[in-house]
Every structure is written in structure tokens, then in C-alpha cells.
Regions:
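Core alpha/beta catalytic barrel or barrel-like domain that forms the active/cofactor pocket
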Residues: 412-414, 442-455, 491-499
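C-terminal capping/lid segments that line or modulate ligand- or cofactor-binding pockets
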Residues: 33-55, 60-61, 99, 114, ...
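Extended, hydrophobic alpha-helical segments in both membrane/secreted and soluble proteins
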Residues: 442-456, 469-483, 634, 651, ...
Length: 810
């Protein structure tokens, strides 16, 4: 359902990003490739003229994991607590991890496995000029083009949602198309490529037959993965060396490629050969079908804050950001790119979007799993307000598939009922696998994920799914916390061991010289984040139980726990404490911002709705985080926090620093600045691509423009000074859609609200305008309450002096 009154300019340049250079990170070209995908299959285009590589990944292809039986070590919890009660934090820290290792537990997370490379070797007889790489985000098409003297070459591809295949077209305007195409095991400069080849041995198959190329390898489970490629064109086609197809003197060739994961290669080869033999649709016809599906998702929401520099290349925009500040054009492009990645990188009935999306370029990358102590949450923050609610169902289905593992975790690690979710998981692996205290002793994952799942219900109103999966999941999480929490001598809840991800209290650090040590002693008592998560979960599950009539016998016990949760504490400087314990002091040289949870990503304290004293303490706590301890994702997180605190210039400054330090020319975000310029932590030789920051930026932009909660929304709550005008189309609140357009210098504001379900809420209108009218009638103040039935609409405008006079006369 679209709101028709607010129109946004459909300038094609807004949805295209242009690069003037190919991927060029030495020995790691994949980092700067351009991504295409249909939510299940990903293609990453390097853009090299003479020796092109397109890396193919499939969401269900993982390898090199290890699963073994989880031993029962629940007795370790009581011993850990004994040591914590004595103040022996260091002794308590490793008890559980050491016992697991002693009992021989050696689980290991799997990693995404690149499926293959599509290789294109081309003659290059003359020096190139006018080189471009272009990603069209509204269609999902990647195009590489260049000229050699007066001859023009283009190579373009997309991964079809409609037909579940990659379609690739190569053209030359002078019949100078000479190319050799083949499929191969993905090549890297890592020793892992050699390991893969040795593991495959005779299982690796690559051959060409007529105009078809076949490729297959075998995974650890004994099942095959591979590809079948068909090539058609007007040049001279011939097989070469038994594994490739050459094209001579062509104007145009089209490549159709299907991929499989699982099954048996000969069966899959025959299946896809039959499919492609009868395939006669042109590239353009296939693109039209795909673009219709892709575009419907991409365009269901829009944000425009830029009116210049829209045609500048990524390199130009990033260079300008490096000089001082990110332009509106770059911020808007980053927002669009975050949405594009999400739409292209995950799908219904697929798997959650991992940290590398569908575009990993190595066989064993750091943090390539689904990490739930920050990262997967950040990846999905933007989806509800951004109109991509469907993606959350995939996340819940993924975690639901691991429930048996999670129940065993709770019993065998802690002697508790319900579920314990380890921070890191991969498909089919829900047991703990990072056997270190900072991960093993953190209990917040299940509760934090419940926030996302319950938001899915609130934004969709899907009560059937609430009853079927969301509320049962919340119930199991609540059962665990009910068992895990103890009462102290004052009758307050006590949570221990309790980890504030991945931080260690300053008072437990071994010395100032170890200030940047990763996490020496994180197992503490009463982390603020744990209380915030438990409080939010129990409030939500009580509400959901009353809506559905389920779990009525548990409500009283949940209410008892809620009443016993202590108030958040402040330290001597007035900032919120990260650990609510007298012996644990705050450590500011850290990237995680977990104790700010009640402000963001939670909504326990909202500026303009709640006690103003508490948010000041949260702001102080954020402001003391040191710049040289941050990462790409933490800067995005910090921007979201400052937006919630209505500090727009601080929020946009975080994005300025992020784009200056942790963004590659293809707009992939990094964990840390590889150039060591003092804007982030020093990651040493490790500079991982992490797309959580891509999504975090998308969310930060949305948070600046719109705050949404159950019964209170704010328009332009943290609009930075540089966003003087702009337009928003169809952002989502929980029961409807909102579109608005503003021009601060012109005194112009118009907002349209469409109620999809019965709506009752308060709106905080922008502070930049002072006289408002609803449906043409003047209103007092800027926080009106509204009540709309499903299907009703409301128009709010800012009035000039003349308009107000005319309204009053009427």
C-alpha cells in the first residue's frame, strides 16, 4: 500500500553506484568486488578486463565445521558462583571453559564455502580507457565496461530471483569479442586453496561439452555442489583443453548458469542441462522478470536527502569524505546499498544474512558465522521500519531449527530449563563452539533475539505466527532466565556470571599496559545489559501472553522477577555503570556499547516520553568511549544511540568517521581501519570485511529521520544540520506507513500517514516548524495524538503565517 501524495524524485543515478577502477586489493580482490544476488546465490564481480573472476556462493554451502556431543558440566555453575561470591573473579572466569576442554569437547563452527569461480579470459590488444564498473541497485545488475580505441566492450550480469540462475552477457560493438570461459574451484592466495584441492582430489570435475561447461566438487557430508553453464552467441564457439569454451570474433554472447548444493552431480548435471537446453529467453527478458521482483522490494521504501553529487563515483565520494565529512550523496548511497545487500543476500526460506553476506572470498574467514552478541542484531535493525519485515521470519526459522541444541545447552551447561543460545552459530550447529569465557558465560543472546521476533509480530500483526513460534521461543528464553537468576540478600535479582559483551571491568584488568587486551576477565556480576534484556523480555512476554491467552500460569512469576530487577546505577561521574556491582568499575577503551541497551536498541527510555535524568547518564557513558577503541560496526551502533538521544550532530559525526576509516570503494564496510590512522582500534594484520556496519548505517539514517515505538513516533528527531531538505516514502511504523517531505529553509513540511491496522499513537512533529495542521485544521503544539481505523489516512502540514490565517477564517 503506497501513500500517493508524497512524491520522491526517481532519478536513476540515485540507485546506481559507479566505480572508475576494478577491484584492486592485492591478493584479496574479492574485498572490492561488486555484489549481485537473489537471496540464495551470490555473485561477486572483480571487474578485471583481461582476467575476470566472478566468485559464486550459495547460502547453504558451508564446510569445515566440527560437531561433537556436548558434555554435562552444569556443576561448574555453582563453583563459578562460589568464586564470584568470594570476589575471586579471575578464578571464576575460566571454570566452565576449562571443564569443557578437560572433557574433550572440541566443537568448531563451519565457514561459508565459495562454490566456484566463473572465469573470463579476454584478449586486450589495445590499452583500455573510459573504464567503469556500475551496480544498479534497483535491478541488481552489475556492469563492467571500457573502450579500446573506438571499440566498446560491456560485460553485465545479474542473479535472477525469477529463474534462479545467473545470466551474463558480453558484448562488443565491432565483432572483436574474443574470450575464453570456464568454471573452476575458487582460487585464493591462501593455503586454504591448496587444502581444498587436496581434499577434493578426483572428486573435482571440470569439463566442457559442445556449448556447455560442467563443474562439481564434493563437500564433507559426501554430497556434491557445482554448476552447469550454457553459452550462446554469434561468434565462433569451440571447446578448449576439455574444460573451457572459446569465443572468437563475436558481437555478443550470453551465458546462463545454474548452481546446485547437495545431491549427486550426475543427477544435477542432467537436470540443469535439460533446463538450459530448452532455455531460449534473452538476457533482457530474464532481466525484466528478475527486476520486477527485486525492484518491488527495493522500492517499497525510499529516502532522499541528497540533491547534488548523485552522479559522482564511489571513489570521488569517499575521497571527499576522507577530507572532512561525508556528503549527503554518500550517506544516501550507503543507506541504499545497505538495503540492496539485505535484499540480495537473504530470502524467504533461505538463511539469515551472515557477516559477509553471500560474498565471502575465502574458505576460512574470521567471524563468518552468525554472531548474536551484536552483529546479527545490527544486520536486521533497519528491516522493520525499512519495510523488509519478511527477512526476520528467516532468522526465527533458523534459530527455531536449532532449538534441540539450545535446550541441551541450558541443561548441560547450567542445569537450567529453557534455552541457552551461544553467541556464534552456523547452520546445523547450535552447541557452544567458541570455548572461551567471554562467549561461553554470556547469556543474553536468546533474550536479545526475542526483541527482534516480537517486533516482527508488532509490525505485521501476525498473531498466528506469534502463537506458533514467536511466543513459544520467548517462553523458552524466559524459562532459562527464571532458573538462572538468583535473589540476593536484599531480595533483588542477581545475575552471575554475567558478561557485558566482550568487555572486562577496569578493576579486573591486569594493568594499564594491557588496556587494549581483548577480554582478559569478562565473567562478572550484574551486567547492566543482562538486566535490560531480561526486563524487556519479561514485559513483552507478559503482554504477548495476555494477547494470546497462553502461559497464563506463568505471568505472576514473571511479574515477581520484574519487580525484583534493581534500578540502573550510575558511577561517581554520573554515567550509567556497565556492571551493577560496587567492585566493578567502568572501562571506556572498548568498542561494545552493551550497557546503553535501555536507550538503544531497547526503548525503555525514550527522549520526550520518559524520565529525562536517566538518558543523560547513558549519553555520558557513550561519550567516554575512546575513539581508538572503536570499529566500523561500533561507530554505526554509536550513531544509532546518538540518534535515539536526539543528538544529530554527534550521530552524523560517527558516520563521518566511519566513511573516512572503514569503507572500501565498493562500499563494503570493514571491522577496522587498515591504514592505522587512529580512528579505530588497531586490528593488526586482520582487517575483516563485516557487513553489519553496512546495515547499521542504514538503520542510523532511518533513526535520524524517524523514531518508532508502539504508541509514540517522532519525525526528524535527530535530523542533522546538513539534511536541510529531503523526502521519505513509506517508512513503516507498527500499524501503518508514513511518508513526509521537508525543506527547513523554505519552511515546508508535509506528512501523510496511512493506517494499515487500527492505530492509536502520539506523534512528535519536527521542531523546525512551529504551526501545524492535520487534514487542514490547525493544532496546538507538536505532539498530537491520533486515532485511525484500518485504511484511514491523515495529512499533516506545516503552515506559513498566511496559511494559518486562512485556516482560522475557514
Amino acid at each position: 500500500m503506497a501513500i500517493g501524495v508524497i512524491h520522491v524524485t526517481q532519478n536513476g543515478n540515485r540507485n546506481k553506484m559507479t566505480l572508475k577502477t576494478p577491484a584492486s586489493w592485492h591478493r584479496d580482490m574479492w574485498r572490492e568486488g561488486l555484489p549481485a544476488g537473489n537471496g540464495k546465490i551470490g555473485a561477486l564481480v572483480y571487474g578485471n578486463i583481461a582476467d575476470e573472476t566472478i566468485v559464486i556462493n550459495h547460502c547453504k554451502l558451508w564446510h569445515w565445521g566440527k560437531r561433537n556431543e556436548l558434555p554435562d558440566i552444569h556443576e561448574a555453575l555453582s563453583e563459578t558462583r562460589k568464586q564470584l561470591d568470594k570476589g575471586n573473579f579471575w578464578d571464576a572466569n575460566t571454570i566452565s571453559a576449562d571443564l569443557l576442554k578437560k572433557k574433550g569437547y572440541t566443537a568448531r563452527l563451519a565457514s561459508p564455502c565459495p562454490l566456484c569461480d566463473i572465469k573470463v579470459i579476454m584478449d586486450s590488444k589495445n590499452a583500455f580507457h573510459h573504464y567503469r564498473r556500475v551496480l544498479n541497485m534497483e535491478t541488481g545488475e552489475v556492469c563492467v565496461s571500457w573502450k579500446e580505441e573506438d571499440c566498446e566492450f560491456t560485460r553485465k550480469l545479474f542473479v535472477s530471483r525469477a529463474d534462479d540462475m545467473l545470466v551474463y552477457k558480453l558484448t562488443s560493438n565491432q565483432r572483436h569479442l574474443n574470450a575464453n570461459l570456464f568454471l573452476q574451484l575458487h582460487e585464493t592466495y591462501d593455503k586454504d586453496t591448496k587444502k581444498m584441492r587436496e581434499e577434493q582430489g578426483s572428486n573435482l570435475v571440470e569439463y566442457a561439452d559442445k556449448n556447455f561447461i560442467y563443474y562439481s566438487a564434493r563437500n564433507e557430508d559426501g554430497r556434491d555442489f557445482g554448476a552447469v553453464m550454457k553459452i550462446v552467441g554469434d561468434g565462433d564457439l569451440a571447446t578448449q583443453d576439455g574444460r573451457s569454451i572459446s569465443v572468437k570474433n563475436g558481437n555478443e554472447i550470453t551465458v546462463y548458469c545454474c548452481f546446485f548444493v547437495g545431491g549427486q552431480r550426475n543427477t544435477e548435471f542432467e537436470k540443469y542441462k535439460r533446463k538450459l537446453e530448452g532455455w531460449n529467453d534473452t538476457y533482457e527478458a530474464c532481466l525484466k522478470r528478475h527486476a520486477k521482483l527485486h525492484g518491488a522490494l527495493f522500492h517499497n521504501v525510499d529516502i532522499q536527502i541528497a540533491d547534488q553529487d548523485l552522479d559522482k563515483s564511489n571513489e570521488e565520494l569517499l575521497f571527499n569524505a576522507y577530507e572532512q565529512t561525508a556528503s549527503n550523496a554518500l550517506i544516501e548511497r550507503m543507506w541504499r546499498f545497505g538495503r540492496y545487500l539485505m535484499i540480495s543476500g537473504t530470502a524467504e526460506n533461505g538463511l539469515p544474512f551472515p557477516l559477509y553476506g553471500l560474498w565471502p572470498g575465502k574458505y576460512r574467514l574470521p567471524w563468518s558465522h552468525n554472531m548474536a552478541n551484536e552483529n546479527i542484531q545490527m544486520i536486521y535493525w533497519h528491516t522493520m521500519v525499512g519495510g523488509l519485515e519478511y527477512t526476520m521470519k528467516t532468522v526465527l526459522d533458523y534459530y527455531w531449527s536449532l532449538m534441540d541444541d539450545f535446550r541441551q545447552n541450558a541443561r548441560r551447561l547450567f542445569g537450567c530449563s529453557g534455552i541457552y543460545i551461544p553467541a556464534g552459530t552456523t547452520p546445523g550447529m547450535g552447541y557452544p563452539n567458541q570455548i572461551v569465557p567471554v562467549i561461553l558465560n554470556w547469556i543474553g543472546a536468546a533474550g536479545w533475539l526475542c526483541q527482534h521476533f516480537y517486533d516482527y509480530y508488532k509490525f505485521t500483526g501476525d498473531e498466528e505466527f506469534l502463537k506458533e513460534k514467536i511466543l513459544p521461543f520467548m517462553y523458552e528464553a524466559a524459562q532459562f532466565y527464571s532458573d538462572y537468576i538468583v535473589m540476593d540478600e536484599k531480595g533483588n535479582c542477581k545475575i552471575y556470571p554475567s558478561v557485558s559483551p566482550e568487555n572486562t571491568p577496569k578493576s579486573l584488568m591486569p594493568g594499564d599496559e594491557y588496556e587494549h587486551m581483548a577480554h582478559p576477565c569478562p565473567s562478572a556480576v550484574n551486567a547492566t545489559m543482562d538486566f535490560a534484556i531480561v526486563k524487556e523480555l519479561f514485559r513483552n512476554i507478559i503482554e504477548a501472553s495476555k494477547i494470546t491467552g497462553m502461559y497464563q500460569d506463568k505471568i505472576k512469576s514473571w511479574e515477581t522477577i520484574l519487580k525484583a530487577i534493581p534500578e540502573y546505577q550510575k558511577n561517581a561521574d554520573g554515567d550509567i555503570k556497565e556492571w551493577m556491582h560496587p567492585d566493578l568499575t567502568d572501562r571506556y577503551t572498548h568498542r561494545h556499547l552493551s550497557h546503553i541497551y535501555p536507550v538503544f536498541p531497547g526503548k525503555e527510555y525514550v527522549i520526550g516520553r520518559d524520565d529525562m535524568d536517566m538518558p543523560v547518564g547513558f549519553e555520558l557513558a557513550v561519550s567516554k568511549r575512546t575513539p581508538d577503541s572503536q570499529s566500523g560496526w561500533s561507530l554505526a551502533h554509536m550513531a544509532c544511540i546518538y540518534a535515539r538521544l536526539e543528538k544529530p550532530e554527534k550521530a552524523i559525526r560517527c558516520l563521518d568517521i566511519l566513511t573516512r576509516s572503514c569503507v572500501l570503494k565498493n562500499l563494503f564496510t570493514l571491522h577496522n581501519d587498515w591504514r592505522k590512522m587512529g580512528l579505530t582500534l588497531d586490528g593488526g594484520e586482520s582487517v575483516p570485511v563485516q557487513m553489519d556496519a553496512n546495515m547499521g548505517i542504514a538503520n542510523a539514517v532511518q533513526e535520524m529521520l524517524l523514531f518508532v515505538s508502539d504508541d509514540f513516533i517522532k519525525i526528524l528527531p535527530a535530523c542533522p544540520e546538513r539534511f536541510k531538505k529531503g523526502a521519505v516514502k513509506n517508512l513503516h511504523f507498527m500499524t501503518g506507513l508514513i511518508s513526509f517531505k521537508w525543506d527547513i529553509l523554505a519552511g515546508y513540511f508535509v506528512c501523510n500517514i496511512a493506517s494499515l491496522r487500527n492505530t492509536r499513537l502520539t506523534i512528535q512533529l519536527p521542531k523546525f516548524f512551529h504551526r501545524y495542521a492535520m487534514n487542514g485544521h490547525s493544532i496546538d503544539g507538536r505532539t498530537p495524538g491520533i486515532a485511525l481505523k484500518a485504511g484511514e489516512r491523515l495529512c499533516i502540514t506545516a503552515q506559513t503565517d498566511k496559511e494559518e490565517e486562512e485556516t482560522n477564517l475557514a
